[in-house]
Amino acid sequence: MRIVIGSFTAFLLLLLQNSNAEIPGCDFFDTVDISKAPRFSNGSYLYEGLLIPAHLTAEYDYKLLADDSKEKVASHVRGCACHLRPCIRFCCPQYQKMQKSKCYGDMSEDELNKHDPFVNVTLSDGSVVRRHFKEDLIVQSDLAKPGCPRMYFLNHELPGNEFTLFENGSLLRHWDKVELSKREYCVQHLSFKDDSIRIAPHFCPLSSEHSRTWKTVAIVISLICIILTISVYLYVEKLRNLHGKCFICYLASLFLGYFFLVLNVWKYSSGFCVTAGFLGYFSVIAAFFWLSVISLTLWNSFSGNSSWLNRFLPQNRFLSYNLYAWGMALLLTAITYIADQVVKNEKLRPRVGVGKNCWIYTGDMTVMIYFYGPMLLIIVFNITMFVLTAFRIMKVKKEAQNFTQQQKTTNRLNSDKQTYALFLRLFIIMGLSWSLEIISFLLSKNQAWAKAFMVADYFNWSQGTVIFLLFVLRPSTLKLLKERIKGGRDEAGASDEHISLQNTKIDPSVF
């Protein structure tokens, strides 16, 4: 019995000893290693000119990681310095630079002479003071870095990159109003393009952001599927009617948009960043205008030869559609470019290529003016045209019941309805995908919603794959492709489901 009681007492003493090894009321990330600092007889330490009393010191045999797990290390004394003076939490040793999330050797004498050692610190009363990182603050450089292999940094001189560093050590990121603790960020000296060296905050990608690798995989598969779809439509003559040609132009625009997006993901377009941003913008906007062309031509096809649109279109309609789609995309790109050059208010500029992001800036609501706004208007237009076309089909079907050549008209109508249904599915997929993209942007500041829309983002990057499944891997297209490979001609009777609206108009007498 005595052995049991003795063992239990020893266990309690061990727990008590371990609990006393931590400084009461002091977070590990508010401490510094003071093992090498002078110690006085009363148990206090003098660290970097700061006297740390004995009750704010303790012996630790671990270090705390960013995820609050403990890593065993040699026993050492730590002091709660950040309760006595504001601290600044470095990623690396205090005189090293950081590049691509990695620490490099100490700065040279020339670099030390030209680097900016000051940071703005916001005090508890809201006032902002300029502080020297070494002389006025306690440097913490032995804490574990945030738990991610790749970190982003903020350049406060760029719009959308502003931040506030508080005296309690937390950092407020302005663009999404998120306050980061010292577990979630660190600062380090960084070389910038203007040859300056400044202290910049570094932090992990948002938890809702996607793996660059998986994002690339989704986009590259989409690009391959788009190429395959274009190839099939160019190879099979029957598919190269008016709708097929418009569809090919849509796919070409979409391909270029995704191509510049994947270049931006891997920073391959950094050498021509602004140009790549505008080319990507032009391509995506052009894809939307081509989608509007498809919805308009479908509506016109079911409206008969008496359609008012026919009076304004020349004989070569495909040329007119090219002038419209590419021309409108070019016009919006030109407006965006001019606004980027002449608008003085940073919050109203498109800011293409800002912050090494070779795309239009999406950090605030300005993107609604230049990108998502026009996109939304075209989506509304497409919805209108598809609804009008659906009503027209129902009217034609009803009138065709009393038509003298009922069988012929019904067959033609069924074929055209299949074409309409096919492109309607395309619009639903594309319209839904980009609508979710807009909603995702509007809710991006909310972490919970941002995570929920991760699936929508992957769906958006996989549009080319969905199109390939929808338009190529369908029985009618595969049948036409098989006959074309065998050397057969794409006669009208080859398939009952192929796109049939090239030269076909529903007889106006039906209406």
Swiss-Prot record:
Highest taxon in the source lineage: Eukaryota
Molecular function in Gene Ontology: G protein-coupled peptide receptor activity; G protein-coupled receptor activity
Modified residues (Phosphoserine): 495, 500
Annotated organism of origin: Drosophila melanogaster
Localization of this protein: Cell membrane
Keywords for the protein's UniProt record, in alphabetical order: Cell membrane, Disulfide bond, G-protein coupled receptor, Glycoprotein, Membrane, Phosphoprotein, Receptor, Signal, Transducer, Transmembrane, Transmembrane helix
Extracellular compartment residues: 22-215, 267-273, 339-366, 444-452
Bilayer topology: Multi-pass membrane protein
Signal peptide as annotated in the record: 1-21
Name of the protein described by the UniProt record: Probable G-protein coupled receptor Mth-like 3
Keyword Lyase listed: no
Major subcellular site: membrane
CDD domains to which the protein is assigned, alphabetical: 7tmB3_Methuselah-like, Mth_Ecto
